[in-house]
């Protein structure tokens, strides 16, 4: 995985809005790489959700290990798979091919930014940010399970991945956790 956008979004001295744009670019890089490496369109919401679940689990593993740089990289993969969920399952015959399908999904993610995470403030820690992301993923799985619209929820998962990347740039204050 390439990380120039992840490095740029970690720069807290720059324009705060630029961090979100750089996070979106990191997700776009992951998405285009995924399309090149795995061009087959997903066949069901269940398939897409389980690919996304794998990335969510890998993100949690990095957070638990306090590997913030790697967690941000995993968050870009979560965002990419959430966008791919929309592009593959809801725009499979869209005009312009895969890139245009993905641009439509990215626009939905951008529009969902104000709907996710804590209102009026940044995420306090990687654990909190993951909690919000996991809540959106759980809502996605619930929508699939009960045959409800999943597309807008997938956009919310991607939007929360953007917030994770943009807002979690260093190791957060240690969170008390049980060690086994």
Each model region followed by its residue ranges:
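Flexible "arm" and connector segments at domain edges
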Residues: 1-180
